[in-house]
């Protein structure tokens, strides 16, 4: 069953791109009849799952958006990019080339490109946040934040399976420790009625 159709509404700057329209209710926010973002062809947005392209976001060329992924605002997926699972690409963020994004949040003017891989850690369920003007060419998974003008070069792999957050900001790296509940100062005793 189809979840969307491609309309005749062309993008103002690129006539090869057309708005989509939901033909069925997908989520509480995406109801039948609502207009979405732009695609170049029906291959850009999977008809299965709850993936959606909204506002002025674009998926074009051979890029694929699927699963429960969301492209919104002015985000762009292009080239042979893959955006899936529960990834959110928003703001003016771009996923391009052969990059794979399977979870996490891309926002600001960030760019995930080349053969980059961004994914949620399956054990901790933590997912990367790429923000600002950060550029990622390597692999990132787990509880990692890249922001500012941070650059993750090709061949670099950041895999954080802890609850602590690794933060790459501009040319600095830091760790934000997860707040932990301190042990009780005195042992707990319970009074039971008899």
PLM feature spans:
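Residues at the loop-to-beta-strand transition
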Residues: 43-45, 51, 57, 63, ...
């Amino acid at each position: 069953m189809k979840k969307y159709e491609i309309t005749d509404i062309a993008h103002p700057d690129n006539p090869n791109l057309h708005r989509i329209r939901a033909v069925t209710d997908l989520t509480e926010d995406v109801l039948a009849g609502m207009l979405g973002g732009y695609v170049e062809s029906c291959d850009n947005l999977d008809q299965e799952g709850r993936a959606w392209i909204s506002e002025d976001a674009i998926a074009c060329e051979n890029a694929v958006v699927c699963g429960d992924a969301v492209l919104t605002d002015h985000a762009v997926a292009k080239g042979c990019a893959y955006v899936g699972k529960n990834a959110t690409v928003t703001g003016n963020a771009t996923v391009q080339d052969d990059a794979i994004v399977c979870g996490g949040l891309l926002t600001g003017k960030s760019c995930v490109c080349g053969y980059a891989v961004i994914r949620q850690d399956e054990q901790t369920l933590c997912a990367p946040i790429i923000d600002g003007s950060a550029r990622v060419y390597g692999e990132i998974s787990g509880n990692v934040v890249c922001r500012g003008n941070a650059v993750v070069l090709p061949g670099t792999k950041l895999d954080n399976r802890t609850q602590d957050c690794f933060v790459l900001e501009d040319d600095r790296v830091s760790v934000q420790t997860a707040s932990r509940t301190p042990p009780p100062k005195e042992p707990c005793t319970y009074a039971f009625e008899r």
